[in-house]
């Protein structure tokens, strides 16, 4: 039976401008990625039932660092810099994108990717690039269509079906679900997927086994 992790115990570990400043590359990391207004921080706060675990901001693109959170020893969640921001100097934008790309390509402990998209504007070019990259390197993806409370039930189901249909083109392990931090919708499915991903890989050597 898959272990259920207590995400309420998640705590902040460190922020890093690039992978060279991250802790040792061991254990299991699940990363959260998305456009700068997709609701990443809100989703992490909802998942962990903590109001301010991840800083939320009215200003898109405030997540400028790779932020690591630990659920328990060797089990981590990662909040990646938002992409697709407009109100940012070009040089800084390139710096963030380089840090994001390095993490995705070189971090061995990365074992799953949650890509968050506003349900009203899903599958933008950068979103598709993010999913395609993960599929290319055999990393499973969970697409969360955030702010689902902004659409009526019928429109929500229609959008979900359209994105699921579009996801088939990636020909990889890509699951699509709706999510609302406000209504707590989709939280159980997110937790279940994280539990499954964390269970798929044995803990890092030296980590205490927990039943």
UniProtKB/Swiss-Prot annotation:
One Gene Ontology cellular component: cytosol
Gene3D superfamilies per the UniProt record, alphabetical: P-loop containing nucleotide triphosphate hydrolases
Pfam families: MMR_HSR1
Keywords, in A-Z order: Cell cycle, Cell division, GTP-binding, Magnesium, Metal-binding, Nucleotide-binding, Septation
MF terms (GO), sorted A to Z: GTP binding; metal ion binding
InterPro entries: G_ENGB_dom, GTP-bd, GTP-bd_ribosome_bio_YsxC, P-loop_NTPase
Residue sites binding GTP per the record: 34-41, 61-65, 79-82, 146-149, 179-181
GO biological process: division septum assembly
Cofactors that this protein relies on: Mg(2+)
Domain of life: Bacteria
Ranges of residues in domain EngB-type G: 26-200
Similarity annotation: Belongs to the TRAFAC class TrmE-Era-EngA-EngB-Septin-like GTPase superfamily. EngB GTPase family.
Biological function: Necessary for normal cell division and for the maintenance of normal septation.
Protein name: Probable GTP-binding protein EngB
